[in-house]
């Protein structure tokens, strides 16, 4: 249950069944376990959710098939960068596509050798495509995210009952700012939403309205009227107190009742509690609600950002590649 919950909350891509090596005889043996070292970025603490998942794998499928994953809690990429004095390279590691390309795709396992096209079709196409370099699936989509609006459902229910507000209004930025103003008036000057990445939102809104190139030299092109208009929409709402910029991450403002909503990475759902604790120490269920990232009204090019990393494997032996593929199947099923 914990594994499925973690995967859902981390916004992992849908699962699939493994069909590696075209159904050939396995190279794995529980009598002679295959050892895999892994570096990951999902929390450096020993008791991180990812480390608990790896322990669960070792105790179940890993023991059954003869695979043992050894976690190295290290975020320093000096070894992968080939710098002197670094530790031995891991068998499996978290990486962005740009990192994988820099390492040389000839040095990495092509996951297409271990998963069929039908298998990969079960994944979000954009996430899969992001890990393909020169026709090879060298980054396996594991932890991906976009941006969402998170709302305190208990507070929203009262707001909606009094004002007739509807979540569908948040589909556009016009509706978002309209609801933000209405909430501030209803709540006696409390901001509606905390934003984690306000500049990125300004950019996306402008691009959806056909702004074209946003930069001139090393900074924004302030003569770009579409960009200026988008900027002013957010600036006006900030000055009026309809929204605010988060303190690091918007879930803090939502969990303390400072704002009704937070707009940030979908992976932030890991950090939302079951209860909101208000300044007077009263609590109530969060009843978390989600809404998609708003878009510019009438846009012909709606944009959805994606972020996150996948898993790569250094090319060593087919035995280790098969073991890595078995682990990925388990992780994403």
Specify the residue positions occupied by each region the protein language model found.
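Extracytoplasmic/periplasmic substrate-recognition and gating elements
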Residues: 65, 279-333
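Hinge/lid segment of periplasmic solute-binding proteins
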Residues: 96-148, 174-177, 285-293
């Amino acid at each position: 249950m914990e594994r499925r919950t973690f995967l859902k909350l981390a916004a992992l891509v849908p699962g699939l069944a493994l069909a590696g090596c075209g159904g050939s005889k396995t190279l794995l043996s529980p009598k002679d376990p295959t050892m895999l070292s892994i570096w990951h970025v999902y929390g450096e603490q020993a008791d991180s959710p990812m480390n608990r998942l790896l322990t669960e794998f070792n105790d179940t499928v890993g023991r059954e098939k003869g695979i043992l994953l050894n976690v190295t809690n290290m975020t320093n990429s000096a070894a992968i960068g080939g710098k002197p004095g670094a530790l031995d390279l891991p068998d499996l590691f978290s990486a962005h596509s740009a990192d994988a390309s820099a390492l040389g795709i000839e040095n990495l396992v092509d996951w297409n050798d271990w998963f069929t096209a039908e298998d990969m079709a079960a994944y979000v196409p954009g996430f899969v495509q992001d890990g393909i370099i020169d026709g090879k699936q060298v980054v396996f989509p594991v932890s991906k995210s976009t941006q969402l609006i998170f709302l305190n459902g208990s507070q929203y229910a009262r707001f909606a009952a009094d004002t007739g507000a509807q979540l569908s209004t948040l589909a556009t930025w016009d509706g978002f700012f309209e609801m933000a103003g209405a909430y501030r008036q209803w709540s006696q000057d409390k901001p509606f939403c905390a934003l984690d990445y306000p500049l990125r939102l300004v950019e996306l809104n402008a691009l959806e309205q056909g702004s074209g190139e946003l930069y001139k030299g090393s900074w924004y092109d302030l003569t770009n009227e579409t960009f200026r208009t988008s900027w002013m929409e957010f600036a006006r709402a900030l000055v009026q107190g309809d929204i605010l910029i988060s303190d690091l991450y918007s879930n803090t403002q939502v969990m303390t009742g400072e704002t009704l909503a937070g707009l940030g990475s979908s992976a932030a759902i890991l950090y939302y509690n079951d209860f909101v604790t208000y300044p007077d120490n009263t609590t109530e269920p969060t009843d978390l609600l989600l809404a998609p990232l708003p878009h510019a009204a009438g846009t012909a090019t709606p944009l959805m950002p994606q972020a996150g990393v996948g898993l790569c494997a250094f090319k060593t032996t087919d035995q280790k590649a098969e073991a890595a593929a078995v682990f990925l199947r388990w992780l994403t099923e």
